[in-house]
Design a protein with these regions (language model features):
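Active-/binding-site microenvironments in catalytic and ligand-binding cores
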Residues: 4, 10-276
Length: 276
């Protein structure tokens, strides 16, 4: 409180709530029984509730019995059988190839510069493009022109595709457009080091690529977006979600990966941060 100079009354300063940014969760959960990956790569989480573990907790202390625990309850715990590529995750260049930047050893997820993972974000809206379509550099430029934005180095560019709304559906891994070599290098040549998609893969769905390969026998089509990392190292976030909630620009994207030693990827709780 402070003194009023003229009246001598003690007045209260008006309280102002501090400005708090808006946080938007753009990640999918790790969960059982959702077709977010091919069958060979599905998540399995085993859950144990408090009553099941009372004996384990009590057994850690000689002379203790489960009935002496509060309400006879232990702890809740989960055991997960997962790949580093389950859930929303950040791929390191090591995932794509043993080398990057034209021959240097590709870096693993624990070696990624953390400052790459907390940067202004740019959302490209490609929901109108058909499933399996391979985005071109011209389409990227046209979308940037539509939103009135010029890319700056180290911005995080994410693609909102038709796959986003298909999460949870049986055909999720076949949905959405993808990015090949040309589009990927078009972005990284402008200083972009982290990209992302709400699809299963940064590349076009495997089912669409398989059809193109069957028609052309062109091996360069296979995983061409990922393999662009041989030429210039970059990271990509896969299986983002809720990108429809984001503006085209004006947000910060946070995607710090879990530090898995010498790994090709790390899980991330990706978040978009908007000013109040």
């Amino acid at each position: 409180m402070y003194e009023c100079a003229k009246s001598g009354r003690r007045n209260r300063r008006p309280w102002r709530t501090p400005s708090v940014p808006k946080f938007i969760d753009i990640s999918i959960p790790l969960e059982n029984d959702v077709a977010a990956d091919p069958p060979f790569q599905r998540v399995r989480i085993d859950y144990q509730a408090h009553a099941e573990t009372a004996g384990v907790l009590a057994g850690a202390f000689p002379g203790m019995t489960p009935d002496r625990l509060p309400d006879g309850m232990g702890w809740a715990v989960e055991t997960a059988h997962i790949s580093t590529h389950n859930g929303t995750h950040l791929d390191a260049p090591w995932h794509y190839h043993p080398t990057m930047d034209g021959g240097a050893r590709a870096v693993t997820i624990d070696e990624i510069p953390l400052d790459w993972c907390f940067r202004p974000g740019v959302k490209l809206d490609f929901r109108h493009l058909p499933d399996g379509h391979v985005v071109t550099p011209a389409e990227i430029d046209a979308e940037l022109a539509r939103i009135g934005h010029r890319l700056s180095p180290f911005e995080i560019v994410v693609a909102n595709t038709a796959a986003g709304k298909a999460y949870g559906d049986a055909d999720y891994i076949d949905r959405g457009c993808g990015f090949g070599r040309d589009a990927t290098l078009h972005l990284v040549s402008q200083g972009i080091r982290v990209v992302g998609t709400d699809g299963w893969s940064w590349d076009a769905p495997f089912s669409a690529t398989a059809r193109r390969f069957a028609e052309t026998n062109d091996a360069s089509l296979i995983w061409e977006g990922h393999k662009a990392g041989r030429e210039k190292g970059y990271c990509q976030i896969e299986k983002l979600h809720n990108l429809e909630a984001l503006p085209a620009t004006g947000f910060t994207l946070c995607c710090f990966p879990v530090k898995v030693r010498a790994a090709s990827a790390g899980w991330t709780r990706a978040v978009a941060i908007l000013p109040d």
